[in-house]
Amino acid sequence: MSRRCSVSGKGPLVGNNVSHANNKTKRRQLPNLRSVKITMEDGTTKRVKVAASTLRTMKKKAAQAAAAN
């Protein structure tokens, strides 16, 4: 399984751990993925991995669409 958001495509980033002595070692910064059920247009549900920031945006867009109706 890849550690990638299925909606936005966000994936791991590479950075450094930096000690007080300024020693640097490589590290990976992983996205905050959540497994959520999404209802498709035909009524079926599908479980996908979505980044928490993307999930927040999706909820905001859904609330705006509901308020517009």
UniProtKB/Swiss-Prot annotation:
Keywords, ordered alphabetically: Ribonucleoprotein, Ribosomal protein
One Pfam family linked to the record: Ribosomal_L28
Superkingdom per UniProt: Bacteria
GO BP annotation list: translation
One Gene Ontology term of the molecular function aspect: structural constituent of ribosome
SUPFAM superfamilies to which the protein is assigned, alphabetical: L28p-like
InterPro entries: Bacterial_rp_bL28 (IPR050096), Ribosomal_bL28 (IPR026569), Ribosomal_bL28/bL31-like_sf (IPR034704), Ribosomal_bL28_bact-type (IPR001383), Ribosomal_bL28_sf (IPR037147)
GO CC aspect terms: ribonucleoprotein complex; ribosome
Region feature (Disordered): 1-27
HAMAP family (alphabetical): Ribosomal_bL28
Family from the record: Belongs to the bacterial ribosomal protein bL28 family.
Name listed for the protein in its UniProt record: Large ribosomal subunit protein bL28
Species of origin: Sulfurovum sp. (strain NBC37-1)
Lineage of source species: Bacteria, Pseudomonadati, Campylobacterota, Epsilonproteobacteria, Campylobacterales
